[in-house]
Protein backbone atom coordinates (compact mmCIF):
# COMPACT_ATOMS: atom_id res chain seq x y z
CA UNK A 1 0.00 0.00 0.00
CA UNK A 2 1.37 3.41 -0.96
CA UNK A 3 1.99 5.78 1.96
CA UNK A 4 -0.58 8.53 2.52
CA UNK A 5 0.80 11.85 1.32
CA UNK A 6 0.95 14.51 4.02
CA UNK A 7 -0.97 17.64 3.03
CA UNK A 8 0.71 21.04 2.77
CA UNK A 9 -1.74 22.71 5.12
CA UNK A 10 -0.64 26.31 4.56
CA UNK A 11 -1.09 25.82 0.81
CA UNK A 12 -4.55 24.39 1.52
CA UNK A 13 -5.44 27.46 3.58
CA UNK A 14 -4.41 29.74 0.72
CA UNK A 15 -6.60 27.60 -1.57
CA UNK A 16 -9.51 28.14 0.83
CA UNK A 17 -8.97 31.91 0.66
CA UNK A 18 -8.84 31.82 -3.13
CA UNK A 19 -11.93 29.61 -3.32
CA UNK A 20 -13.88 31.84 -0.92
CA UNK A 21 -12.95 34.89 -3.02
CA UNK A 22 -14.61 33.24 -6.02
CA UNK A 23 -17.72 31.96 -4.25
CA UNK A 24 -18.55 34.73 -1.78
CA UNK A 25 -18.91 38.32 -3.07
CA UNK A 26 -17.93 39.62 0.38
CA UNK A 27 -14.42 38.21 -0.19
CA UNK A 28 -14.11 39.00 -3.91
CA UNK A 29 -11.41 41.62 -3.25
CA UNK A 30 -8.99 39.03 -1.82
CA UNK A 31 -5.96 37.83 -3.78
CA UNK A 32 -4.54 34.72 -2.14
CA UNK A 33 -1.29 35.12 -4.09
CA UNK A 34 -0.53 38.25 -2.02
CA UNK A 35 -1.31 36.59 1.33
CA UNK A 36 1.42 34.53 3.01
CA UNK A 37 0.13 31.80 5.34
CA UNK A 38 2.45 30.40 8.01
CA UNK A 39 2.32 28.24 11.12
CA UNK A 40 3.54 30.10 14.20
CA UNK A 41 3.93 30.09 17.95
CA UNK A 42 1.14 30.45 20.49
CA UNK A 43 -0.27 33.87 21.27
CA UNK A 44 -2.43 33.60 24.36
CA UNK A 45 -5.56 31.59 23.37
CA UNK A 46 -5.57 32.75 19.75
CA UNK A 47 -6.52 30.43 16.87
CA UNK A 48 -4.94 32.66 14.25
CA UNK A 49 -3.86 36.23 13.53
CA UNK A 50 -3.45 38.49 10.53
CA UNK A 51 -0.67 41.03 10.07
CA UNK A 52 -0.98 43.81 7.49
CA UNK A 53 2.32 44.49 5.75
CA UNK A 54 1.39 47.96 4.57
CA UNK A 55 1.02 49.32 1.05
CA UNK A 56 3.58 48.55 -1.64
CA UNK A 57 4.95 52.09 -1.31
CA UNK A 58 5.77 52.01 2.39
CA UNK A 59 7.71 54.37 4.66
CA UNK A 60 11.38 53.67 5.22
CA UNK A 61 12.05 51.35 8.13
CA UNK A 62 9.33 48.78 7.38
CA UNK A 63 10.39 45.26 6.29
CA UNK A 64 9.19 43.85 2.97
CA UNK A 65 8.09 40.24 2.45
CA UNK A 66 8.61 39.15 -1.15
CA UNK A 67 8.07 35.53 -2.23
CA UNK A 68 9.22 34.49 -5.71
CA UNK A 69 9.37 38.14 -6.66
CA UNK A 70 5.81 38.93 -5.54
CA UNK A 71 5.36 41.33 -2.66
CA UNK A 72 3.10 40.04 0.10
CA UNK A 73 0.51 42.40 1.57
CA UNK A 74 -0.66 40.26 4.51
CA UNK A 75 0.57 37.40 6.68
CA UNK A 76 -1.92 35.00 8.26
CA UNK A 77 -0.39 33.04 11.13
CA UNK A 78 -2.06 29.83 12.25
CA UNK A 79 -1.51 29.29 15.97
CA UNK A 80 -1.01 25.90 17.71
CA UNK A 81 -4.63 25.72 18.88
CA UNK A 82 -5.74 25.81 15.22
CA UNK A 83 -3.70 22.67 14.59
CA UNK A 84 -4.21 20.77 17.83
CA UNK A 85 -7.64 21.68 19.22
CA UNK A 86 -9.89 22.87 16.39
CA UNK A 87 -12.57 21.02 14.45
CA UNK A 88 -12.87 21.37 10.68
CA UNK A 89 -15.61 23.98 11.06
CA UNK A 90 -13.52 26.00 13.51
CA UNK A 91 -10.54 25.96 11.15
CA UNK A 92 -12.63 27.35 8.30
CA UNK A 93 -14.18 29.94 10.62
CA UNK A 94 -10.72 31.07 11.75
CA UNK A 95 -9.47 31.51 8.18
CA UNK A 96 -12.49 33.57 7.16
CA UNK A 97 -12.37 35.50 10.42
CA UNK A 98 -8.81 36.67 9.78
CA UNK A 99 -9.30 37.65 6.14
CA UNK A 100 -12.56 39.44 7.03
CA UNK A 101 -10.32 42.05 8.66
CA UNK A 102 -8.68 42.89 5.29
CA UNK A 103 -9.46 46.26 3.73
CA UNK A 104 -11.75 46.27 0.69
CA UNK A 105 -8.93 48.11 -1.09
CA UNK A 106 -6.64 45.11 -0.54
CA UNK A 107 -3.71 47.46 -0.12
CA UNK A 108 -1.86 45.97 2.83
CA UNK A 109 -4.08 47.60 5.45
CA UNK A 110 -6.98 46.38 7.59
CA UNK A 111 -10.61 47.43 7.31
CA UNK A 112 -11.06 50.28 9.79
CA UNK A 113 -14.70 49.35 10.38
CA UNK A 114 -14.03 45.68 11.09
CA UNK A 115 -11.84 45.93 14.15
CA UNK A 116 -12.97 44.04 17.23
CA UNK A 117 -12.75 47.25 19.23
CA UNK A 118 -15.25 48.83 16.82
CA UNK A 119 -17.72 46.00 16.17
CA UNK A 120 -17.30 43.84 19.27
CA UNK A 121 -20.01 41.13 19.20
CA UNK A 122 -21.34 42.48 15.90
CA UNK A 123 -18.19 41.18 14.17
CA UNK A 124 -19.20 37.57 14.80
CA UNK A 125 -22.81 38.29 13.84
CA UNK A 126 -21.67 39.58 10.44
CA UNK A 127 -19.18 36.77 9.89
CA UNK A 128 -21.35 33.82 10.94
CA UNK A 129 -23.59 33.68 7.82
CA UNK A 130 -20.54 33.94 5.55
CA UNK A 131 -18.94 30.96 7.29
CA UNK A 132 -22.18 28.98 7.00
CA UNK A 133 -22.43 29.70 3.26
CA UNK A 134 -18.85 28.74 2.61
CA UNK A 135 -19.02 25.54 4.65
CA UNK A 136 -21.83 24.45 2.34
CA UNK A 137 -19.72 25.16 -0.76
CA UNK A 138 -16.18 24.11 0.17
CA UNK A 139 -14.67 21.53 -2.23
CA UNK A 140 -14.19 17.98 -0.88
CA UNK A 141 -10.40 18.10 -1.29
CA UNK A 142 -10.14 21.21 0.90
CA UNK A 143 -12.50 19.72 3.46
CA UNK A 144 -10.26 16.65 3.59
CA UNK A 145 -7.09 18.72 4.00
CA UNK A 146 -8.50 20.82 6.83
CA UNK A 147 -9.87 17.71 8.56
CA UNK A 148 -6.47 16.01 8.55
CA UNK A 149 -5.49 14.07 11.66
CA UNK A 150 -1.77 13.35 11.94
CA UNK A 151 1.41 14.97 10.67
CA UNK A 152 0.99 17.62 7.99
CA UNK A 153 3.41 20.10 6.43
CA UNK A 154 3.32 23.87 6.85
CA UNK A 155 5.36 26.91 5.88
CA UNK A 156 7.14 28.41 8.88
CA UNK A 157 9.53 31.29 9.42
CA UNK A 158 13.21 30.44 9.54
CA UNK A 159 13.76 34.13 10.24
CA UNK A 160 10.70 36.17 11.17
CA UNK A 161 10.25 39.80 10.06
CA UNK A 162 10.13 42.28 12.89
CA UNK A 163 7.81 45.30 13.05
CA UNK A 164 10.53 47.60 11.73
CA UNK A 165 14.04 47.67 10.32
CA UNK A 166 16.66 49.18 12.60
CA UNK A 167 20.17 49.81 11.45
CA UNK A 168 22.98 48.17 13.31
CA UNK A 169 20.91 45.23 14.51
CA UNK A 170 21.21 41.66 13.17
CA UNK A 171 17.41 41.42 12.93
CA UNK A 172 17.15 44.56 10.87
CA UNK A 173 16.76 42.87 7.48
CA UNK A 174 15.02 44.98 4.86
CA UNK A 175 13.62 42.24 2.61
CA UNK A 176 12.41 38.75 3.56
CA UNK A 177 11.87 36.12 0.90
CA UNK A 178 11.25 32.41 0.41
CA UNK A 179 14.81 31.92 1.68
CA UNK A 180 13.54 32.86 5.14
CA UNK A 181 10.74 30.27 5.09
CA UNK A 182 10.85 26.49 5.33
CA UNK A 183 8.36 23.66 4.91
CA UNK A 184 8.27 21.65 8.12
CA UNK A 185 6.07 19.13 9.96
CA UNK A 186 3.18 20.13 12.20
CA UNK A 187 0.92 17.83 14.19
CA UNK A 188 -2.80 18.18 13.53
CA UNK A 189 -5.34 16.79 15.97
CA UNK A 190 -8.85 17.01 14.56
CA UNK A 191 -11.85 16.67 16.83
CA UNK A 192 -13.92 15.50 13.87
CA UNK A 193 -11.25 13.87 11.71
CA UNK A 194 -12.18 13.00 8.13
CA UNK A 195 -9.13 10.83 7.60
CA UNK A 196 -7.89 7.81 9.50
CA UNK A 197 -5.63 8.83 12.41
CA UNK A 198 -1.98 8.00 11.93
CA UNK A 199 0.65 7.45 14.58
CA UNK A 200 3.78 9.50 13.96
For each predicted feature, which ranges?
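N-terminal regulatory modules of eukaryotic gene-expression and nucleic-acid-associated proteins
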Residues: 2-3
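A short acidic, glycine/proline-enriched capping/turn motif at secondary-structure boundaries
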Residues: 44, 82-85, 101
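Short pre-active-site segment immediately N-terminal to the catalytic Zn-binding motif
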Residues: 78-94
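Metalloprotease/metallohydrolase-associated module, dominated by Zn2+-dependent proteases
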Residues: 7-72, 76, 105-200
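Active-site recognition of the HExxH zinc-binding catalytic motif
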Residues: 91-105
Amino acid sequence: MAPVRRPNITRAVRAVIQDASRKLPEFAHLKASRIRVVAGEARRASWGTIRPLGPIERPAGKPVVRVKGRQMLYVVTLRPRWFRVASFDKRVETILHEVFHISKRFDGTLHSGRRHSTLRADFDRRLRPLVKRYLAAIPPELRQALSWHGTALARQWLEKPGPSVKRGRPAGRRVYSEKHLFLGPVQMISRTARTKPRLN
